């Protein structure tokens, strides 16, 4: 695995997502980020509690907790956008550059490294399968960001992609993603 990581080049993006298999050490995300430190590789982390908190010292480009995971990290129940933003900023204080907080049917909040806060609702639709919607949101966010470095564009594309995934029985189509994007 480390040999593959060593082939990453400046400008590449690495997404670390999900739980860690029992066959790997619990600190594998930390070891990966430590190994890549100092290189110009954008790292995205979509993981829960300690897996996420323990990598913040390596300043990941983007982290994506949901609002429930965010509250769990700090032992609080987050009741509104103001509280979600407050605790999202605490993750930045710990080292995250950009924090994307998904809120299921309530949309998402993005707190950028520039200090901007973007809040976007979720498009209307019937949830058919939410498995993978968070992963789709990350992929959409990166697609939008890579277009021109615009965080607001990235947030809209992330929400459209995650929503299209949740509103589909199988994989979302580009047509459905763009239809939802236009609603935002």
Feature names for model-found ranges:
Residues 34-35, 53, 81-184:
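Conserved phosphate-binding/catalytic region of the ribokinase-like
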Residues 13-83:
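Conserved beta-alpha-beta core of the PfkB/ribokinase-like small-molecule kinase fold
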Residues 12-13, 98:
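Structural motif
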Residues 1-10:
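Conserved phosphate-binding/catalytic loop of the ribokinase/pfkB sugar-kinase fold
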């Amino acid at each position: 695995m480390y040999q593959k990581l060593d082939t990453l080049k400046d400008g590449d993006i690495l997404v670390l997502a999900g739980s860690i298999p029992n066959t790997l050490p619990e600190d594998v995300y930390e070891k990966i980020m430590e190994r890549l430190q100092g290189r110009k590789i954008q790292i995205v982390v979509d993981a829960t509690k300690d897996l996420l908190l323990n990598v913040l010292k390596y300043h990941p480009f983007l982290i994506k907790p949901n609002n429930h995971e965010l509250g769990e990290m700090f032992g609080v129940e987050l009741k509104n956008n103001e509280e979600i933003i407050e605790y999202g900023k605490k993750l930045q204080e710990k080292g995250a550059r950009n924090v994307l907080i998904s809120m299921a049917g309530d949309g998402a909040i993005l707190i950028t490294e520039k200090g901007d806060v973007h809040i976007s609702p979720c498009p209307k639709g019937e949830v058919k399968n939410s498995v993978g919607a968070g992963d789709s949101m990350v992929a959409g966010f990166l697609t939008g960001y890579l277009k021109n470095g615009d965080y607001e564009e990235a947030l809209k594309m992330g929400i459209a992609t995650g929503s299209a995934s949740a509103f589909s029985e199988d994989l979302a189509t580009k047509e459905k993603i763009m239809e939802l994007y236009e609603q935002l």
